[in-house]
């Protein structure tokens, strides 16, 4: 079940941002990809109810080694935005 949630949000994000799976899991500081990952972490955690440790493990399964603190930072980055931005994210991904 957790993997299904992870995959669902992964494909929603890469399709919305028009990036490849390889780019999503590539170590880069490209603003668009970093923002996509932050939104992905936020969705998995808040909407998908995945634990941070599960997100970290599944990211690692795809070859992207990330620490708990980086996932928490990404989640907090989106949490600190205005509520209408969060709603816009969900609407644009057809999750509302």
For each feature predicted by the language model, list its residue ranges.
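DNA major-groove recognition helix of helix-turn-helix
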Residues: 45, 75-82
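Residue-level preference for well-ordered alpha-helical positions
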Residues: 14-15, 45, 56, 60
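Non-catalytic, well-ordered alpha-helical scaffold segments
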Residues: 7, 38-39, 69-72
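Short, amphipathic alpha-helical "recognition" segments used to contact nucleic acids or chromatin
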Residues: 33-50
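General nucleic-acid-binding
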Residues: 1-11
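Short, Lys/Arg-enriched anionic-surface-contact patches
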Residues: 11-37, 66
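Short Lys/Arg-enriched helix C-cap and helix-to-coil transition segments
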Residues: 82-96
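Short, basic interhelical loop/turn and adjoining N-cap
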Residues: 51-53, 57-74
